[in-house]
Amino acid sequence: MIEVGEYKVKEGLYYTKDHEWAKVLDDGTVLVGITDYAQKELGDLAYVELPEVGKEVNKGDVLCEIESVKAVSEVYAPVSGEVIEVNEALEDSPELLNEDPYENWIAKLKPSNLDEELKELMDAEAYAKYLESL
C-alpha cells in the first residue's frame, strides 16, 4: 500500500484520473471500484445505484452513481465491456465503500478492449504522483 498524506493507494490495480480503480482477475474479467481518495472526498455514502447486469459500457461512460451526505457523484467505467456482475451487498450497505474501498468493488466487467485501454490507465505509483499534484 502506498500512502499519500491521508490517502491509501493499493498496488497491483489500475487507476483513472476520476478516482476509479480496475483490477484484472485471472479469468480476464475486471473488477471496478472507487479509490480511497474518492470515498474520503465523498464522505459517508448513503446509496449506490448499481449498474444493470448486461449493460454495455465504453471506457469513460457513466457506470453508476453514488450518493453521499455531501453530493451525488458519477462513477465512470475505466475500461469498455459488459457488466456481468454487481456487488449487491452495496445495496444495503453502501458504507462498505467507506470502510474498505479496495476490497469492496462495485461491478465486474467482461472487457472488450482490455489490452489497449489498460495502457491509458495509471499504475499505483503514477496514481500516487497524480494525487500529490491535486
Curated annotation (Swiss-Prot):
Cofactor(s) listed: (R)-lipoate
Alphabetical list of InterPro entries matching this protein: 2-oxoA_DH_lipoyl-BS, Biotin_lipoyl, GCV_H, GCV_H/Fam206, GCV_H_sub, Single_hybrid_motif
Gene3D superfamilies reported in the protein's UniProt record: 2.40.50.100
Any one cellular-component term (Gene Ontology): glycine cleavage complex
A GO BP entry: glycine decarboxylation via glycine cleavage system
Positions of post-translational N6-lipoyllysine modification: 70
UniProt xrefs under Pfam families: GCV_H
Claim: Ligase is one of the keywords in the record: no
Keyword set, alphabetical order: Lipoyl
Keyword presence, Glycoprotein: no
Details of cofactor binding: Binds 1 lipoyl cofactor covalently.
Domain Lipoyl-binding: 29-110
Family listed: Belongs to the GcvH family.
Subunit structure: The glycine cleavage system is composed of four proteins: P, T, L and H.
Protein role: The glycine cleavage system catalyzes the degradation of glycine. The H protein shuttles the methylamine group of glycine from the P protein to the T protein.
HAMAP family on file: GcvH
Protein name: Probable glycine cleavage system H protein
Organism listed in the record: Thermococcus gammatolerans (strain DSM 15229 / JCM 11827 / EJ3)
